[in-house]
Amino acid sequence: MSRVFSVTLILFILSFSVSASDDPVDVRHEMMEGVLDGAKAIGDMLKEKREFDAAVAMDALLVWQKASKEFGDLFPEGSYTGGEDKAKETVWTDREGFNKLLADFAREVDAAVAAEPQDLEALNAAAGPIFKVCKKCHEGYRIEGD
């Protein structure tokens, strides 16, 4: 099962290449889907709904790391959709706050990748701060819903 997850994440990472012709709304949506898949995998490990797997955890962290480096560029002026993609208008009206949380996300993810968690306790220590940043960002910059 972890091999399938790893292959899926690798394919997702390879599909991240953003070119000038890609629609930023579509790309950011796909990127968040990958981040969400990683969050589910790590969350299930932390809740002990899934056996700890260091390779799967690292794959998820690497997807998050790639997203942390590219995500900010996917919200250019004029790309607000009126909420169709769950991004609140505050992404654009409070860009400084949004960019700060993106920087916090990148810092925490980089630290987690560097830590290379090899057990559940280490994964919890590495992922906890990341999930806190995610929560803050979603509270201020994401429209809640299904």
What is each PLM-predicted segment?
Residues 2-10:
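Sec-dependent signal peptide recognition
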Residues 1-3, 19-20:
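Domain-scale selection of a single, long terminal region
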